[in-house]
């Protein structure tokens, strides 16, 4: 059985707490992930949100988008609203051939209410 390894960018910077690696450039994250032997990386806050920008950036470091995270707030929004909001990310993931998306309900968490 073959295994493909991917990593999350939280190993370099934390989207929820920017004081933890917020000054680390995306290019450093991608370079070091590639140098460490990973072929995939999750999306993160520093990643371009348009496929025409993201795909060349990933290709530059010989990486693929392997997954990513979507934080839904189903306490405040309806499921129909969340389905509308996630569409841009789904298109990006489809364009990048990402095999999965992590759907998380963030109500009451630092992601859903950082204050």
Question: Where is each model-derived feature located?
Answer:
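Active-site groove signature of glycoside hydrolases
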Residues: 93-115
